[in-house]
């Protein structure tokens, strides 16, 4: 007796439904690998702290770069960066989002991205508590670096998503009702009446 194999529902947590499976799997690899190296190093190889520290920092840096520049753009259409004004030295964050009309978002990619983005800082906070209560203060330095990197990406992508939704709402409100067309038409006609 054969059973019919049902396909996973769209948006479910199956990498096979991803529009960019290699990007998704690489993203998940970097997200998970730094935590695993830290956990295994802290419990099994604690005598070689320097090696675990270096490998974990390298994995965190690769995760930060890959998430910021590749996974965010390909999986959810969001990107951010920091620009510094050369004259004043002031920095500002710049957020970029793909045009929602020209880019169809995959529900699976979106779900994996946001879940992994928010879960990892929580797991690093748990690691901080474990290191604190275990009196492993030297491991706490590594957790602090991990928290800075993961929280920076989490905050930046959250803001980027918020601004992309706000700009999408504003453009839909203006162009959808013809408000921008009427306003521009009125300004142009007033200009030529003078």
Curated annotation (Swiss-Prot):
Keywords: Glycoprotein, Golgi apparatus, Membrane, Transmembrane, Transmembrane helix. The chain crosses the membrane at residues 22-42, 44-64, 112-134, 138-157. GO terms for biological process: protein secretion; vesicle-mediated transport. Glycans are attached at residue 106. It holds the Pfam family DUF846. GO terms for cellular component: Golgi membrane. It is a multi-pass membrane protein. InterPro entries: TVP23-like (IPR008564). It is found in: Golgi apparatus membrane. Golgi membrane protein involved in vesicular trafficking. Belongs to the TVP23 family. This is Golgi apparatus membrane protein TVP23. It comes from Phaeosphaeria nodorum (strain SN15 / ATCC MYA-4574 / FGSC 10173).
